[in-house]
Amino acid sequence: ADANEAAYAAQEAAAAIGFSIYRTEEMAELISYMRQYNESALEGEDLRFYGFDMQRISYSMRFLKESCKELEVDTTNLQKLVEGENWSSECDLSTRIETLTQVKKELESKNGSENAIHFVDILMQHSELQTLTNADGATLRDQFMAENVQWILQQEQRNGHEKIFVTGHNSHVAKWGSFDSMGKLLSKDAACLI
């Protein structure tokens, strides 16, 4: 029964990522492996799962609000920015950017706020993408994803880990194509093997 529960939990976790391309047996197996590995891993040697896309705001907003509460940063105005899993129709883009900029400024004065600041940056990335056309938005999205992967690598390097494993849609991880995909951008960095 435990193996079945673990397999089901892994499938749920894969589905929770939100993108249908990850609702696969292979992703469920990867998550299951990570869970099993972490059960016996030494402290600091556990595997972590990060997201680098900014298309969905719900997790970034949730983690930002949790971090703000821990750091004693008021979340009242952040609460007004969202309705469920989307931006509130009550707040226009300039209000959203102004609120996020103010929260970021307050977080920058707090120790231990690096992750929270990154969540603000991701929410600002999402906001900026909404103002662009499809072609411009696709290019900028991949640029943001490359920046976010670099941020993840920096976090892991701070923990003494020199390598990360990145998975994504072929059009994003590829280093070929007519536009600067995340993979193409990262392949220009000597620290990245694509």
Report each predicted region and the residues it spans.
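Structured catalytic-domain cores with a bias toward divalent-metal coordination
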Residues: 1-194
